[in-house]
A protein has these predicted regions:
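Glycine- and acidic
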Residues: 65-69, 81-91, 113-121, 180-187, ...
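Flexible glycine/acidic-rich beta-alpha junction loops that bind and position SAM and/or redox cofactors
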Residues: 16-20, 127, 157-161, 183-188, ...
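Radical SAM enzyme core and accessory elements
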Residues: 23, 32, 296-429
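Short, small-residue-biased leader/transition segments that mark boundaries at the very start
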Residues: 1-6
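Canonical Radical SAM [4Fe-4S] cluster-binding loop centered on the CxxxCxxC motif
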Residues: 62-98, 413-428
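Conserved SAM/AdoMet-binding glycine-rich loop
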Residues: 105-258, 262, 266
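N-terminal pre-triad scaffold of radical SAM enzymes
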Residues: 56-84, 108, 149-150, 171-172, ...
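N-terminal [4Fe-4S]-dependent radical SAM core
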Residues: 12, 18-69, 385-397, 426-429
């Protein structure tokens, strides 16, 4: 009997991989003539008409995600060079605002949840955000429904919205500059300047906020000690701004600035897929630079610093860019009792190290080397719409510290236009 395959689903056994002596891929070929050489990403172009759960299941027990989640758009126009979602979900497709109002009403009515969260990769870029948020406030605020807006840029509009939907005394502002210095922010194409951060903070402090969370990554390509030291310096400037902006009698205690750093892991389908990683010791040394920098600041009493475990980062790096050889090690870890390893209390790095050793896998091969531009990657047979040529250009732009504009400012020819919809065709009527 013959079996049918759904178009563009990947069946590993139908492809054969050969390797060079150095362990990199020599070829990746289908074993039958009628098997496609590349797998094309399938995409829903009309997000408004796509099925969305109007009656999400509500569990008997209290769940962590105890709220209605409303997706307002898919994709992101920003093009941060470290971000996989921003590349994989191109092009941006918005949902119609009237449809979203209707969905919000139906979902809140059917679940009885007391919170609605607007979900997207960058909510501030949703073109009808103001109308949607004002509708939700007018319609549901009086009924005891909280409105949560993750991934907002901090500006006058979002602060105005947040002051309407949050308890200012309890809530904090979140910025994700990702890198401490402007130079490194240009390398990663994160279009957030110090001016924007300080201006947003000042407006927030004037509005009564006094808690700020800052998120950064350590170990980004081209990072220097100067870039690391810029992280506590930025936090100190924000703290100084609070004490300059808010007169003593109006202060709600001292300001609290929390810096959190994670260690950067290069991901497939991003401009940084060629980047090298570091050893756990090197990562922790970077965190130490930041920690010492925090203690050296004038306002160090207002600054708190959290950092990640480094061995989890290295493991994530192996899994993120691993090939099919890693599969056997995964099975071994499971056989050794590794099941809830994403929970720190169950995580045992030794178990992973043993599994890799037993399979004869040199993990440094996946983490410690910068890839050649012409290397064939284990995921190259998947066509996500964004071309490898575009990613190469962006990898070069990163090293040249050149910023690429977002999709609404200017098309950079990433390849996603071939899907025939979304942001690529927004203003082409």
């Amino acid at each position: 009997g013959s079996e049918m395959c759904i178009r563009d689903s990947y069946v590993p056994s139908l492809y054969e991989v050969t390797y060079k002596e150095d362990g990199t891929i020599a070829s990746f070929e289908p074993i039958y003539e009628d098997v496609p050489k590349t797998i094309q990403k399938q995409i829903v172009l009309n997000m408004t008409e796509a099925v969305y759960p109007e009656k999400p299941v509500v569990p008997f027990i209290k769940a962590t995600q105890d709220r209605v989640v409303l997706e307002i758009q898919r994709g992101c126009i920003r093009g941060c060079r470290f971000c996989q979602a921003g590349m994989v979900y191109r092009p941006v497709r918005e949902k119609n605002v009237e449809h979203l109002k209707d969905l919000a009403y139906k979902m809140l009515k059917s679940t009885g949840h007391e919170e609605i969260s607007l979900s997207s990769l960058s909510s501030s870029d949703y073109s009808e955000l103001e109308e949607l948020v004002n509708f939700l406030i007018d319609e549901f605020k009086g009924k005891g429904v909280n409105i949560s807006l993750p991934s907002l840029r901090i500006d006058a509009f979002s602060l105005d919205v947040m002051s309407k939907v949050q308890d200012i005394k309890k809530s904090s502002l979140t910025f994700a500059p990702e890198a401490g210095s402007q130079r490194l922010r240009d390398v990663i194409n994160k279009g957030l300047t110090e001016e924007v951060i300080l201006n947003g903070s000042r407006l927030a402090f004037e509005g009564g906020w006094n808690k700020v969370k800052l998120y950064f990554m350590l170990g980004l390509p081209t990072e220097t000690e100067e870039d690391m030291k810029a992280i506590p310096q930025l936090a100190n400037e924000i703290a100084a701004l609070y004490y300059d902006t808010v007169p003593k009698e109006k202060r709600n205690g001292k300001c609290q600035i929390t810096i959190s750093t994670s260690f950067f892991v290069p991901k497939p389908f991003t401009p940084f897929q060629w980047a090298a990683m570091y050893t756990p010791g090197d990562y922790l040394a970077r965190a130490r630079v930041v920690n010492e920098g925090v203690h050296a600041q004038l306002n160090h009493k207002s600054i708190k610093y959290n950092w990640h475990e480094a061995d989890v980062t290295v493991l994530e790096g192996i899994l993120a860019r691993g090939d099919r050889k890693i599969g056997q090690a995964l099975l071994k870890v499971y056989e050794k009792g590794g099941i809830f390893d994403a929970w720190s209390e169950y995580f045992d790095y030794q178990r992973w190290e043993d599994a890799f050793a037993e399979c004869g896998i040199d993990t440094d091969f996946y983490t410690m080397r910068e890839r050649d531009l012409d290397e064939i990657f284990p995921w190259d047979f998947i066509d996500i719409g964004v071309s490898k040529e575009f990613l190469k250009r962006e990898w070069k732009n990163a090293h040249d510290e050149k910023v690429t504009p977002n999709c609404r400012m200017k098309c950079s020819g990433c390849g996603a236009m071939k899907f025939g919809g979304g942001v690529c065709f927004e203003n082409k009527d």
